[in-house]
């Protein structure tokens, strides 16, 4: 149990998808204007990562891995296309659920919801799972932890962005300029976790 807790903490803080690896920056910067929208997208990313990483782990272990289906046959060259297909299917299902049960969040996320399909944070989580050879349970923990870390970062950025509306930001830095500086400072803060050995 201690191993899974340390894997979760590591994926949230030490190896944060957004602030350590800078993955998923397109939606991270675009949807960080309001805390409510950022929180909704963060939940969507947690759900997609929490399902996509373990599902792709099963696909990789039982179909694509060397000698998984038939002795001597290696289908790992199909990793990218297969993982993207699984992620796209999961995002499509999530999009239908949000449209039916949470229409306000669906409309607020707009074009960025389908973009989760090609969000490199999702694909990065799956790639890290393969590279690190996680088991199914480790994949579940890692997927949920990585999604939680990404959500933590985007909600924090959205909160700071909302507060900056009342700040006297120099004209040349308004908009993305101050956002990039803020993200850089947040990443510096998360770098302090990099020395922790779990």
Curated annotation (Swiss-Prot):
Residue spans crossing the bilayer: 11-31, 35-55, 77-97, 110-130, 140-160, 176-196
UniProt KW Disulfide bond keyword: no
Principal subcellular localisation of the protein: membrane
InterPro entries assigned: NqrDE/RnfAE, NqrDE/RnfAE_oxidrdctase, NqrE
GO molecular function: oxidoreductase activity, acting on NAD(P)H, quinone or similar compound as acceptor
UniProt enzyme class: translocase
Keyword check for Ion transport: yes
GO cellular component annotations of the record: Gram-negative-bacterium-type cell wall; plasma membrane
Subcellular location: Cell inner membrane
BP-aspect Gene Ontology terms: respiratory electron transport chain; sodium ion transport
Catalytic function, reaction form: a ubiquinone + n Na(+)(in) + NADH + H(+) = a ubiquinol + n Na(+)(out) + NAD(+)
Disulfides per UniProt: none
Highest rank taxon of the organism: Bacteria
Membrane topology reported for the UniProt record: Multi-pass membrane protein
UniProtKB keywords: Cell inner membrane, Cell membrane, Ion transport, Membrane, NAD, Sodium, Sodium transport, Translocase, Transmembrane, Transmembrane helix, Transport, Ubiquinone
Pfam family of the protein (one): Rnf-Nqr
EC number: 7.2.1.1
Matching NCBIfam families: nqrE
Function: NQR complex catalyzes the reduction of ubiquinone-1 to ubiquinol by two successive reactions, coupled with the transport of Na(+) ions from the cytoplasm to the periplasm. NqrA to NqrE are probably involved in the second step, the conversion of ubisemiquinone to ubiquinol.
Family membership noted in the UniProt record: Belongs to the NqrDE/RnfAE family.
Subunit structure: Composed of six subunits; NqrA, NqrB, NqrC, NqrD, NqrE and NqrF.
UniProt cross-references to PANTHER family, sorted A to Z: INTEGRAL MEMBRANE PROTEIN OF SOXR-REDUCING COMPLEX, NA(+)-TRANSLOCATING NADH-QUINONE REDUCTASE SUBUNIT E
Protein name as it appears in the record: Na(+)-translocating NADH-quinone reductase subunit E
Native organism: Pasteurella multocida (strain Pm70)
